[in-house]
């Protein structure tokens, strides 16, 4: 009897040659590093060097997060990933009334160039690749990073990293949007153009399925809705007059890795194949780098449990293995205590050690795409591709990703799947170790990391000092220039950078744009 995958597709008890009858390896696979990139985007993949170990971190003040980053670097991390607090993600300063109670809680508070300078103090920005998980205010945070690099004497052409900058998934699954979709897409196109000219090695967007998966999307939904968003971004940039090969090589993606190894490996392989064909056939991309779906992976936080949290170490190791077998370019392995609170120093170190064991104590880096030709994985890859393309066609029938978002299509599909998962967990049909099976009579005590509530007052004091010391007329003039650019067609990042250089805050920059573009209010808001 066939078992159902997370995407509702059959997994047979036994597979043989009949599962791949008529299957053409030249068409479906190709060679690693060659179209359609099913086997990976680079010919040697991990046989030359392992993936980038990019641990996501940030909490409290810039000084506290800086200490964590330097600790991670000392422990062997090969890339940084910045977590910002909710006020920063929403474009509010730490002393804004709406920010009360949230400053520094789920990430680091960054209000101005002063904070960004402290955040990367003692970290040479030409020697580290930095990912910033920031969306609606991605442009000002990137510009703050560039300003700090200039202070270090590092040219923008030497900076490497990624901004998430994917606002469409915020409307679908997460909610940290600021502006309506149309001006949000304009800001993203401006960022593409700015980075091509100013920061050419920077990945301008990380088109994200991770958050959809955490909200309940199946693997097929995750890649379908992510790639549909990617198509919308490409269309936006092309409509703004950019050649596809001028920006597409800097596009990147972000996916989840669950414990269901076979389906996850198939998911990553199917996503690469679909994207390569879309870019070549729909957009006429000629540069091979424009066809490559390069992606970062984070292990599935939604699968971690507060009960028996040490079991999460096992879950994360399995999830990380799935990401590696699927050909990820970089990986964050969650800390075992993240279902309870922000990671402690110890749990963050163990999370990094998990990746290091995978890279250096197993043989998964010895050969490229070890599942190639597997009856089950190739069958599942084809099935997932077909399911994802069918969902992408439904998005297209609704008028594309933005129109489908406005109609609530993606959100509704994800919510239905999330409800199914919850029902299966509640009934015991879906086994969760330590939650509905193999429970302890009494949970062992665990002391989590606690963020100092006094951080909010300290950030407010820093802001007060900043506002008292800076040249207020220069700030006002720079913000006025930003608004003028937003009202017209000029690239807003140039006046935005000058405003931030004059020590305007992130909140002031975002408020200036709110005055011109307005704020998004979802149609299903209560």
Walk through the language-model features, giving the residues of each.
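Generic, well-ordered alpha-helical scaffold segments in large soluble proteins
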Residues: 59, 68-75, 113-123, 144-148, ...
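Flexible glycine/proline-rich, aromatic-decorated loop/lid segments
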Residues: 243-247, 285-299, 307-334, 343-368, ...
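Short beta-alpha connecting loops at secondary-structure transitions
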Residues: 101-105, 169-179, 212-217, 255-260, ...
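Conserved strand-to-helix beginnings and helix N-cap segments that scaffold or border functional pockets
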Residues: 66, 142-143, 220, 265-269, ...
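Phosphate/diphosphate-binding loops
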Residues: 111, 129, 134-137, 149-151, ...
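Catalytic alpha/beta active-site cores
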Residues: 1-258, 263-264, 282, 289-296, ...
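Short acidic (Asp/Glu) and glycine-rich catalytic loops that position anionic groups and cofactors
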Residues: 49, 95-98, 168-170, 206-209, ...
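Flexible, glycine-rich loop/tail regions that form catalytic "lids" or insertion modules at the edges
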Residues: 3-22, 31-37, 86, 344-345, ...
